[in-house]
Each structure stands twice: as structure tokens, then as C-alpha cells.
Amino acid sequence: MKASSLADFAIPINPDARLCVFRLKEQAFVNQRFIRLTLREPPHTDAELVHALLNSTLGMFLIEAAGFGRGLGVLDLNATKLSKTFHMLNPDRPDAAAAARIKAYFRPLLARSIRELPKEIACPDRLDFDSCIAEVYGFVGLEQGIREGAEFLYKIRKSAKD
């Protein structure tokens, strides 16, 4: 494998009830069960901030929207499609103080287990984290709609096993 195949982050290609993006401690190869994400401009890009943004409820909504339900209710993600269509919040937009606030609100989520998506997006620490992101990026008041959209897509996907 080429060094250009190293990942900074990984997303399972078939996540089930728990949806998240993993951050690797250092760049590494990932196997075929994961989609690799690589920072475009390391070391200038804040990997901790990118990790937080990818794991926001908006990030989870965008991941859910990029895939489709496959048997047993798992999400089927395609690396090629994701590389061409996936978007995320711009990590260069927040100033240093705002980026530090986002990361501070994200740390409690890292300190606990990930819950199933409907329970996860209702957790008080996640609500605070998402509110911080909405404030920094200027979409205050839209958080509930984003949560509802993420949960709606999740329920459609999970209904595939019923």
C-alpha cells in the first residue's frame, strides 16, 4: 500500500445503531470494513476540531444521508460516493477561541460510550456540544430540525430489518 492510503479518521462502511467517526492516534492503514478519511493539509488542519465536527449531529446526519439501508438495518456507505458527495463544516472557519470551545464541549462525549443514535442525539452533553457548533457556525435554532432529520433517516434505515 502507498503512504497516500493512510487514514487520519475512519468510518465503518456498515455502521449499525451507533454512528461515529473514529480518529486514529497516528496515521495508519485501515481495512476494507472502514472508509478512510485523510486530512488535506496536515499539520495545518486541526485534527481534533475536524474529529469534533465530523461527530456532531450535523455530521452524523450527513453520513446517514450519504448511505442507504441495507439488510438488517445497517447503513451501507460507499467510499467512492462519499469521496465525491460528502460535505462537512469548514474547520478553518472558527477563530482559535471558538475552535477551543467546540473541542471543550466535545471532550465529554469522548469520555463516555457512544449510544444508539436516537439516544445519543438526546444526551444533554451532546445537546450542549451541538448548540456550541450552531452558535459558532451561525445556525442557531436549526439544531432540533437537524436532530429530527438524523433520527428520521436512522428510523428509515432501521425499518429495513422489520
Q: In which residue ranges do the predicted regions lie?
A:
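Polybasic, glycine- and aromatic-enriched phosphate-binding surface used to engage nucleic acids
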Residues: 1-100, 104
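Non-catalytic DNA-recognition/assembly elements of restriction-modification systems
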Residues: 90-162
